[in-house]
């Protein structure tokens, strides 16, 4: 029903079923994992009105499992990428895996999937740092480049009284640069690939 993928490792499709509605994947050497993808295999959909809460568990310094809610998968959203690298020192949250006897080893974390009502999923709050940024690196680069250019150009701003007339030099009013900057930001927000047209 589910699959789990860590970059550079084989895809896991054989989740350990620990209860009728609970599944876990082991993540050996979890200290070296930054992101994990959880997805539905497409062979068995969730029953109508159901989805799966996705949890990350790692052993604390005493070997006690710390569970943190990452997010969810549903028939309408059959896959999700989660950033887990920053979660390994956080606090746990409420989870449905507490009373289960799940075999653990010290350097193995787990991804847990709990099949629950969609209404219940909508009320849960995942750990904030688990979400992968929806802004791609190109958009981030473009935004940083815009900010850098505007700040650089603005650092040379002079009032007309401060200017020394030089007929061989052109000048661009700062308000024109600001207008371009705001226009570019607006267009980038509407369509990050607008520059390709």
Curated annotation (Swiss-Prot):
Its name, as the record gives it, is Protein Hikeshi
The molecular function terms of the Gene Ontology recorded here are: Hsp70 protein binding; nuclear import signal receptor activity
Localization terms from the record: Cytoplasm; Cytoplasm, Cytosol; Nucleus
Please indicate if the UniProt record lists Transferase as a keyword. no
Q: How does it assemble?
A: Forms an asymmetric homodimer; required for binding and nuclear import of HSP70 proteins. Interacts with ATP-bound HSP70 proteins. Interacts with NUP62 and NUP153 (via F-X-F-G repeats). Interacts with HSPA8.
Region of interest called Required for F-X-F-G repeats-nucleoporins recognition and nuclear import, as start-end residue ranges on this chain: 18-55
What family is reported? Belongs to the OPI10 family.
Q: Which gene encodes it?
A: Hikeshi
Q: Could you tell me what this protein does?
A: Acts as a specific nuclear import carrier for HSP70 proteins following heat-shock stress: acts by mediating the nucleoporin-dependent translocation of ATP-bound HSP70 proteins into the nucleus. HSP70 proteins import is required to protect cells from heat shock damages. Does not translocate ADP-bound HSP70 proteins into the nucleus. May also be indirectly required for organization and/or function of the secretory apparatus in Club cells in lung.
Origin superkingdom: Eukaryota
Stretch list, region Flexible linker region involved in nuclear import of HSP70 proteins: 124-134
TM helices/strands, residue ranges: none
The annotated phenotype of a deletion mutant is: Mice display severe emphysematous enlargement of the distal respiratory sacs at birth. Club cells display enlargement and disorganization of the Golgi complex and formation of aberrant vesicular structures.
For this protein, the record's InterPro entries field holds: Hikeshi-like_C, Hikeshi-like_N, OPI10
Q: Which cysteines are joined by disulfide bonds?
A: none
Keyword set includes Magnesium: no
């Amino acid at each position: 029903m589910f699959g789990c993928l860590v970059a550079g490792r084989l895809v896991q499709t054989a989740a350990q079923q620990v209860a009728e509605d609970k599944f876990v994947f082991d993540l050996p050497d979890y200290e070296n994992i930054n992101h994990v993808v959880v997805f539905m295999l497409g062979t068995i959909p969730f029953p109508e009105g159901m989805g799966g809460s996705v949890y990350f568990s790692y052993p604390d310094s005493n070997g006690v499992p710390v569970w943190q809610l990452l997010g969810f998968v549903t028939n309408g959203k059959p896959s999700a990428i989660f950033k887990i690298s920053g979660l390994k020192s956080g606090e746990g949250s409420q989870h449905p895996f507490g009373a289960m006897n799940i075999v653990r080893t010290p350097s193995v974390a787990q991804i847990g999937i709990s099949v629950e009502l969609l209404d219940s999923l909508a009320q849960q709050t995942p750990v904030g740092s688990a979400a992968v940024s929806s802004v791609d690196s190109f958009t981030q680069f473009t935004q940083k480049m815009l900010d850098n250019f505007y700040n650089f150009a603005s650092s040379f701003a002079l009032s007309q009284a401060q200017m020394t007339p030089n007929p061989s030099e052109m000048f661009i009013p700062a308000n024109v640069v600001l207008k371009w900057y705001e226009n570019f930001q607006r267009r980038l927000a509407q369509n990050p690939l607008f520059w390709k047209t």
